[in-house]
Regions:
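Glycine-rich adenosine-cofactor-binding loop
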Residues: 30, 119-124, 140-161
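Short, Lys/Arg-enriched N-terminal segments with co-localized hydrophobic residues
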Residues: 1-15
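NAD(P)-binding Rossmann-fold cofactor-contacting core
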Residues: 164-188
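Phosphate/diphosphate ligand-binding glycine-rich loop within oxidoreductases
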Residues: 18-134
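Short acidic low-complexity segments
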Residues: 192-211
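Active-site glycine-rich loop that binds ribose-phosphate moieties when present
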Residues: 126-131, 137, 150, 154-155, ...
Length: 211
């Protein structure tokens, strides 16, 4: 609550006269996005870092995403973030994918590098940075992940890329994502050499041994 209050106060102090013809554009593309606090965080970060950029939200869905990306690219946008429902659809519209984005098949950050759109997935990286900041090294360790949502898959991929010996994913066998996650685990193992296995949540023995 304090953080939100601080950001809101900063937003109220924001001077629109600071925006000029040189100000770079960055954005969030998703639907819905009106509730997002991303503009508060990013615009305050730009201010503190002395960067001449502005961050806006655009309500864009999977159907309108291709036209939106083409238009933003033409206008020279420096980069943009993706939120639901666009993280998977954006992949086919990009020129290049980072290693983790290739493994996950989803992108939340796009950089416009002189007209070449490069996609990244920063969810796993952000999580692993927090782990490192807490003084932990996952190299050669087993990672246990509960759930098969987008953030979970990103953490699995980043764990494998960062040197984990194994990743154990626990999910409901009745989940509609079970088969997709099984293929993801097999592909991640083959591409990284990390042993990635999928277990049923009800396999309490496997869960206990993994933890």
């Amino acid at each position: 609550q304090y953080f939100m209050s601080l950001l809101q106060n900063r937003l109220e102090d924001f001077n629109m006269n600071n925006i000029t013809g040189h100000t770079g554009l960055t954005a969030l593309l998703g639907s819905p996005v009106a509730h997002s606090i991303s503009p508060l965080m990013h615009n305050e970060s730009f201010r503190l870092l002395g960067l001449d950029y502005v961050y806006l939200c655009f309500d864009v869905n999977e159907e309108t995403l291709p036209a939106a990306v083409a238009g933003l690219k033409t206008c020279g946008i420096r980069g943009f973030n993706l939120t639901m429902p666009n993280k998977n659809k954006i992949v086919e519209l990009l020129d290049e994918l980072s290693p983790e984005a290739q493994l996950i098949g989803a992108v939340n950050t796009v950089l416009n590098d002189n007209g070449k759109l490069i996609g990244y997935n920063t969810d796993g990286y952000g999580f692993m940075q927090s782990v490192r900041d807490a003084g932990h090294d996952i190299t050669g360790k087993n990672i246990t992940v509960m759930g098969v949502g987008g953030a979970s898959m990103a953490i699995c991929a980043q764990s494998a890329l960062d040197g984990a010996a194994s990743v154990h994913i626990f999910a409901r066998r009745t989940s509609r994502y079970w088969n997709r996650t099984q293929k993801f685990a097999e592909n991640l193992s083959a591409k990284t050499g990390c042993q990635v296995c999928l277990f049923d949540n009800d396999d309490h023995t496997a869960l206990r041994d993994s933890i």
